[in-house]
């Protein structure tokens, strides 16, 4: 059964490594050393719920609800555009230290709300967990399925805590004005590129719904 665990771990790691909204947010919180371990835990727990739902049967709900998928897609587009705009606005600020200080004033609940939006309004999360993991893990018998799910969940926990701790460790080097400007520009551009990609997918979904 351990082979199914490592299959799940490898697949989970492959899907979670690319830079996306979730990883960018965890990295930024780590650099700020602001609730970064709590955010890592909440991201990992969110993945636990999504992975379990996808592998143990939740994928059918998403595939049978095209309107739900369209709603999540356009909600994700709106959020990513807003999040990317905020990052670019901070990067282009004439007084980046002041802008960063304003961001640091965000309360715990606002940070948690942003994390939940970053995770749950990203349609790619549902495609990864419900479609990819659901189609692969769903074909297994119950015992191998549990080991497969445990492997993917382990990869998520290891990655988010590792990313948060590494970013916090590198914070003295990454909190310089130049580094923060580069990071915010990178995050903003990536968020807008993902939003553009989601918008194209959203248009395709809407076209399919009305034709």
From Swiss-Prot:
Belongs to the LysE/ArgO transporter (TC 2.A.75) family. Pfam families: LysE (PF01810). InterPro entries: Arg_export_ArgO_enterobac, LeuE-type, Lys/arg_exporter. It is found in: Cell inner membrane. This is Arginine exporter protein ArgO. Keywords: Amino-acid transport, Cell inner membrane, Cell membrane, Membrane, Transmembrane, Transmembrane helix, Transport. The keyword Acetylation does not apply. It comes from the Bacteria. GO terms for molecular function: L-arginine transmembrane transporter activity. Involved in the export of arginine. Important to control the intracellular level of arginine and the correct balance between arginine and lysine. The keyword Repeat does not apply. NCBIfam families: 2a75 (TIGR00948), PRK09304.1 (NF006801). It comes from Salmonella paratyphi C (strain RKS4594). One of its GO terms (cellular component) is plasma membrane. The chain crosses the membrane at residues 1-21, 37-57, 68-88, 111-131, 147-167, 179-199.
